[in-house]
């Protein structure tokens, strides 16, 4: 009995192709401690510190293992995670799960978040940039891996929708339609910080000058029973070779980011993501051996 039996028995992906399915795995500092591997924890790898304005909920914070499944078909991604969890039911307990989405379009445009602004304009794109920003160059088990900073961000859409366009653009420091920074014409034009409001999101993030790779997705979970408003927002995911890059950015955003009027950080985690698997090897081999 092989995986084909599972495929046929569950049936949810019969007739579907892989739709560019990819899986990313990571572990937290608590994972290393629970398995007696704390001596192998890199010095830069520790839980994220508290940040101003966040209202973290225990159910969305921490955890020992993270699995990110991405595919062009949500059912394919869910099927992959479902079967991984099924294999470990006697060993693990699920903490939380969120289904995210991003506008595909023609794949040439930067996707927009639920506020209608382009999200990920300043991402690294070249192999050289990835080596400089994303992949660790450490000599230990994290060689070739990356650190994932994960934040669950609730977006207050009703408040945002009552805000005029100029105020929305001032919040970001970019024009909504084109994505261009203030004072410029095109989305990817170099940002002139002097043209941006001092409390704008882009200016505060750019002041730190610590590039990261954003792989964020929007989410929608129906209605918040307490507020009667949409339970929706952003699954913010950033990869970097040094977690301090994200920490410095988020610290600078701090309490002065105008965006905080429209969002609340409710979940958080930091995970060390393994490098790819060599032929004949297994995930995390360098850590466990």
Predicted regions and their residues:
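Long, histidine/aromatic-enriched segments associated with O2/redox biology
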Residues: 1, 5-289
